[in-house]
Regions:
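A short beta-loop-alpha structural element at the N-terminal edge
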Residues: 1-15
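Conserved GNAT-fold acetyl-CoA-binding loop/helix
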Residues: 18-45
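Conserved beta-hairpin
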Residues: 52-67
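A short, internal acetyl-CoA/4′-phosphopantetheine-binding micro-motif in the GNAT/acyltransferase core
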Residues: 70-84, 107-108
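Conserved acetyl-CoA pyrophosphate-binding loop and the N-cap/start of the following alpha-helix
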Residues: 83, 87-95
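Conserved GNAT acetyl-CoA-binding A-motif
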Residues: 98-110
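Conserved catalytic-core motifs of GNAT/GCN5-like acyltransferases
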Residues: 106-108, 124-141
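Conserved active-site tyrosine of GNAT-family acetyltransferases
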Residues: 118, 123
Length: 147
């Protein structure tokens, strides 16, 4: 069910990210220009085309989620909003840990739902944080085992 992404998956990957950003991040950032102007499927497809080597999808006949793994860093993990709470995110995260030894990620400080998800999978906030570029928000570093 989890496989390396192909060029044919790019539209679906981008669509999943757009849906998630608008649903979960727009209420925090409230930037119409970005969320309804710049954040578009075609531009994300172009961005991801050069990163296919780090993209993996959960595919059970339909691509329902994806994860981007760069070395041991989890750069992105998104599941189609209508498919959440069905163990898809867990499967993607467990794959990253088992197959790529993924052990760290940055999470938006106000994204408590994501933080709880990662905590359930053995990740813990390290106390290190950095500003989210161009915003007043912060990202928190989470590591597996809190190392």
């Amino acid at each position: 069910m989890i496989r390396k992404a192909t060029k044919n998956d790019l539209a679906r990957i981008a669509e999943i990210q757009v849906f998630n950003y608008r649903l979960y991040f727009y209420p925090i950032f409230r930037t119409d220009e970005y969320f309804f102007g710049e954040l578009q499927v075609p531009s994300l497809m172009r961005e991801y085309e050069s990163r296919l080597d780090s993209l993996y999808v959960y595919d059970d006949g339909v691509v329902r989620g994806f994860i981007m793994i760069e070395g041991t860093y989890i750069a992105r993990l998104f599941v189609e909003p209508v498919c959440q709470n069905a163990a898809i995110g867990s499967a993607l995260l467990e794959y990253a840990v088992a197959e790529h030894h993924a052990d760290h990620l940055w999470v938006l400080e106000k994204n408590t739902k994501a933080m709880r998800f990662y905590e359930r999978h053995g990740f813990a906030a390290t106390g290190e944080k950095k500003p989210e570029e161009g915003t007043a928000e912060y990202l928190l570093l989470m590591k597996r085992g809190g190392r």
